[in-house]
Amino acid sequence: MIYDDENRGRVWEPDPQMQAPQMQAPQYSPQPDPQQAAAMERRQRKQFSHVGMAAAAFMLITLAAQVVVMVLVMLLDSLLGDFIDFYGFSGRMLMSSLPMYLVAFPAVAGLLQLVPKCGSPQKEQWGFGRFAAFFVIAMGIGLAGNILGRLVGILQPSGPDSAELDQLIRNSNVWVNLLTTVIMAPVVEELFFRKMVMDRLLGYGQKAAIIMSGIMFGMAHGNFSQFFYAFGIGLLWAYVYAKTGKVGYTIGFHMLFNLLGGVITVELSKGAQGLTRGPWMIRQIE
């Protein structure tokens, strides 16, 4: 089309690339479907329930296996007499720990394979400084939680309910403590409470998965006095796994934590009290 410029008397043609302005339709965010939201909530509750039942099965199978082991020990003791001291502190430590790690864990790991995974952890790369900072935080949480648990235990009419476990650890052979508390416990507990549990909950929110892992880890320790520090430590290590996706990191944290708190500190304390003979950390075999 030709336009006449009345002011200058010139003729010009419009640029073919010029377009008339167009009105944009208003954008509306889609409203969530109430039925889909309700279905998602049901799936979430079902997933959390299945994981919780697996944790309960872990404790029940452990208890049942411990009873079976005790019955077998009584039979062996009646046959062998005093040939093996099953009822010493080291024997009791093994009878308490091995059913959990060698019987209950494989059984519950198989059950959890029936629960589909949901979500995945992040893949952050951490440096040594951050790991060191988190370990210092873990030691602080462990100390504060232990103090709180002991204060609560003192208020109980029966006294602290962790006293028997403390006695077992303090009086067991150092090699038994290394096997159970430094090697087996960190590997089994981190694989279960961090890897297996969180891989099935992270899809419903990182915070929910971390809190659930911490609560289950605290309750798995079996007494109220130990719940506080185990819950706090469980939260911290669950956070580490959620951010890095490396269960090996949390196993390493757990091993070092138990080595310092459950072996080195105990052996130094026994040495100071004259309960250890021979080289450092080597207890006399009775």
Question: What is each residue range found by the language model?
Answer:
Residues V176-E286:
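Transmembrane helix-loop-helix hairpins at the membrane interface
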Residues Q36, M40-Q44, F86, S120-E124, ...:
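Juxtamembrane loop-helix boundary motifs flanking transmembrane segments in multi-pass membrane proteins
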Residues M1-S120, G127, L256-E286:
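N-terminal, membrane-interfacial amphipathic/helix-forming hydrophobic leader that caps
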Residues F83-G91, C118-V188, D199-L202:
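Juxtamembrane helix-loop-helix connectors linking adjacent transmembrane helices
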Residues M70-M74, N146-R150, R194-K195, D199, ...:
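Short helix-terminus and kink motifs of transmembrane alpha helices
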